[in-house]
Amino acid sequence: MFTVAIHDMVERIGTWLDDQIDGATIFGPSRFGKSSAVDHWLQRLLSERYGGYVPLVVWSHTDSGSATAVGRFYAHLLEASGHRLAQARRSPLERQTMLVERWIELAAQGGGRFLVLVIDEAQGMSQREWLWLVELHSLLEKQRIRLCVFSIASLQFFDEPLGMALAGGAHVAARFMLASAPFHGVRTVDELAYVMRGYDEGSEWPAGSGCSFTAGLAPRPWAGGFRMADQAEALMLAMQDALPPRYAGPVDFPMKTVAHACRHVLLRVASGADVDSETSATAWQAAVENGGHRTLMALVSATAALRGAGRRESGHA
């Protein structure tokens, strides 16, 4: 489902591209919908924004292993770039050459002199992997190709640029980590209603039927006026009520919870269960709790509390 956060992420990345930023970070808690935004929306929305194909490689980070595994690092990027010989036996130098040539080819397909690399799960990147990426960036620069690296990372990654600089990787931080922006969850009832309206209007099931998810799955309730968007306030209250005690994180709710709860309730209604019963406050609370919402938000709270404590210690130092 499309969200305000996805729109904001695409607009932010578009602005960074316009400003010729070499690298930046989108950060947010786990399960808030970052990977879904990258996998299902980023390419199409960037292409719409620029009125044509945008050369984009999305790599969900996989650890390359030991410090000598640069060849495996290149193989992972070759596979993400759609190279047909990504897994063929080659020396690290040969793989590096193949990768640079592939990226030059993709940049040319975009009709420009730039390529976008999106690294999902970037919090797992090691310093040596960042250094290997710097080398690739430099090789492309010599070919007059601008490589723009956007990292999609978990919340704790926010402090990584300073940590990288202090660890001797200032040139990495300066090249790829000078800008950052948060990826929010669902924050208001209006935002939630917008997302849930996607079940009513912005979807199709079965494919080619012309019916939305709600109409296709629950035709009788739909005919009787049932709409998922009308349930936004009830779901928001259920998510708020399920926050852990002394919650210290942002008032942002994950798309994982929203999708799980909506799917559960919609399928119950579709099965013939009583609509009023399945959309009661108690039913929404159960749907939220059973999706692991409280545990997930406890993790968000703990991370936020640790970051807050770290900032306070730094301020007293």
PLM features: residue spans?
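Sensor-1/coupling segment of RecA-like P-loop NTPase cores
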Residues: 25-30, 125-129, 140-167
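A short helix-turn-beta junction within AAA+ P-loop NTPase domains corresponding to the substrate/partner-engaging
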Residues: 163-185
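Mid-core helix/loop region of P-loop NTP-binding domains shared across ATPases and GTPases
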Residues: 5-12, 16, 67-120, 124-132, ...
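C-terminal alpha-helical "lid" subdomain
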Residues: 2, 25, 37, 44-48, ...
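Conserved AAA+ ATPase "sensor/coupling" helix adjacent to the nucleotide-binding pocket
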Residues: 80-81, 186-187, 194-208
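Conserved nucleotide-binding/hydrolysis micro-motifs of P-loop NTPases
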Residues: 32, 62-66, 154-159, 186-190
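Walker A/P-loop nucleotide-binding motif
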Residues: 17-43
